[in-house]
């Protein structure tokens, strides 16, 4: 009888395989912690207040904060009063990056948040539910002396959430409100060297536009982009892991097709998991260095969603295939209650992502969180996905409990077996429990490292060595799930090692009733694995 490799592998060989995988896991963490820089960099920008004194404020002119063709600018709003400069004449200009620097495609993306400095004035206070409306233009160029090319031009509304902690009295005029930061812009590629933002705050009292928003003194931006050094390390890992997973996947499927039976459901799911992992690994990001592919962030989200949906489905089916009877097993329809929440939750998160990053492909200033309807819609999708996730884990915990109970019940029949056969089945049970514990350890490690990366400063220093915790989290967890999928396809590939007839009927010395109980699910020579046969009878009872 041929089972999976894990069922025919000795403890010594299994430990050797585990040790090799552990070494690669440590290397994955060290690559991020010691070689790669931090994943992202945050840069603060202070806008420059330029003056547009032309009639009708023609939009084709770009206001540059510094350089040979810099704009006519004022230091503060108070300077505008004696010069009779109106609010509609002021353009807040931001040049990206800072002077004497260039942006690079290795930065992969740009994310900006906005902070308004609003002073308290008795005659110009922030009204309840106030909304600031910005007229924003984004341009780019690849040469310091070239003309600016418009990239986007949108009206950008944002709701203000500000509090004033001091008493609203004349002596506290001029103090700043404490305002929440606002989402401003996200671009999925950095294909150009220089970017320019021109932000206007047009005032129209008749239409109540930018009325009751306080006295805006300054506009600050914080730009976040991926570090080029981290990008190179990340691409290198993807380039290395892609052929590794692809080769083991081809080898795995070849061994399955060599069997005289069709693939069972669990084997198909493991193969699909390998495909989804390969889909994530394929380093298509290399093309983003030479092409302006703004959809890469959305594409990355979709790839991750497919992988996690397959991973969650595998855990359910892996448990179910060890507890269901022959009629229910090997059919995906038998898992509709457990897989259904995965499908619904994944679909909700996909719709949410399309509503956010999908729209940002044409409007980089869009955010679903800026309107009440958008916020409610986003929360609805997230809540439904959260409920589905909770239902999934309830199903999973119940199935894991059932499997362990079935195995524990079957262990009571082990003392009646011969020593050789008893040791054989004890080894099978140990390996099943071992894989379950490894799965829990991988999930726990993912959560732990995520929490650590959020609460630490991003790096640790031990003597003269600096460890980038956040980078180690990304490379380590990414490597861990690759190793997990690799181990699954290797250990659960069909083994070509057979138990001889003398072992089955002689050396193992099993009573006829026991033999019937343990082999009742065998339908042909290359039937289900040994652990399936061991647990099915208990599930039926």
UniProtKB/Swiss-Prot annotation:
What membrane topology term does the record carry? Multi-pass membrane protein
Q: Which residues lie on this side of the membrane: Lumenal?
A: 37-232, 290-303, 353-380, 453-471
Its chief place of residence is: Golgi
One Pfam family it belongs to: WLS-like_TM
Annotated GO biological processes are: anterior/posterior axis specification; intracellular protein transport; Wnt protein secretion; Wnt signaling pathway
Q: Where is this region: Interaction with Wnt proteins?
A: 101-232
Per the record, its GO cellular-component terms are: cytoplasmic vesicle; early endosome membrane; endoplasmic reticulum membrane; Golgi apparatus; Golgi membrane; plasma membrane
* Cysteines paired by S-S bonds: none
Where does the record say this protein resides?
Golgi apparatus membrane; Cytoplasmic vesicle membrane; Cell membrane; Endoplasmic reticulum membrane
Q: Which residues lie on this side of the membrane: Cytoplasmic?
A: 1-15, 254-268, 325-331, 402-431, 493-541
- What are the TM regions of this chain, as residue ranges? 16-36, 233-253, 269-289, 304-324, 332-352, 381-401, 432-452, 472-492
At the top level, the lineage of the source is: Eukaryota
Q: Which UniProt keywords apply?
A: Cell membrane, Cytoplasmic vesicle, Developmental protein, Endoplasmic reticulum, Endosome, Golgi apparatus, Membrane, Transmembrane, Transmembrane helix, Wnt signaling pathway
An example Gene Ontology molecular-function term: Wnt-protein binding
Q: What does this protein do?
A: Regulates Wnt proteins sorting and secretion in a feedback regulatory mechanism. This reciprocal interaction plays a key role in the regulation of expression, subcellular location, binding and organelle-specific association of Wnt proteins. Also plays an important role in establishment of the anterior-posterior body axis formation during development.
Family per similarity comment: Belongs to the wntless family.
Complexes and interactors: Interacts with WNT3A. Interacts with WNT1, WNT3 and WNT5A.
Q: What is this protein called?
A: Protein wntless homolog
The top of its lineage is:
Eukaryota, Metazoa, Chordata, Craniata, Vertebrata
